[in-house]
Amino acid sequence: MRRHLEEQVADLLDSMKVPYQYEGEKLTYTIEVKYIPDFKVGDVYLETKGYFPPEQRRKMKAVKAANPDLDIRIIFQSPHNKINKRSKTTYSMWAEKNGFPWCAYYAIPVDWLR
């Protein structure tokens, strides 16, 4: 048991001979939040990223999962930065692995802008 209160409740249930499971299941849940893309050009959403921390990467994956038909592309300030000091994965590698077209801010493809 992780908490003293949990131990107390378990003791009570045990003393009453109530069958139970302690943390026996994992339940999923969704927190409804809004995502505001940086730019929309036609039907394409452009998200700009300088520093790209784990919570932002999780958010982008969640946005893509919730909106699989949207065309979301990422413009990186430094696409070859590693996602963390110990990783070999760069921002651009992460984008490719997760199905996001990407480019560097200084090399935005012209066809993205039409």
Name every feature range the model reports, one short phrase each.
Residues M1-R114:
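Nucleic-acid endo/exonuclease domains
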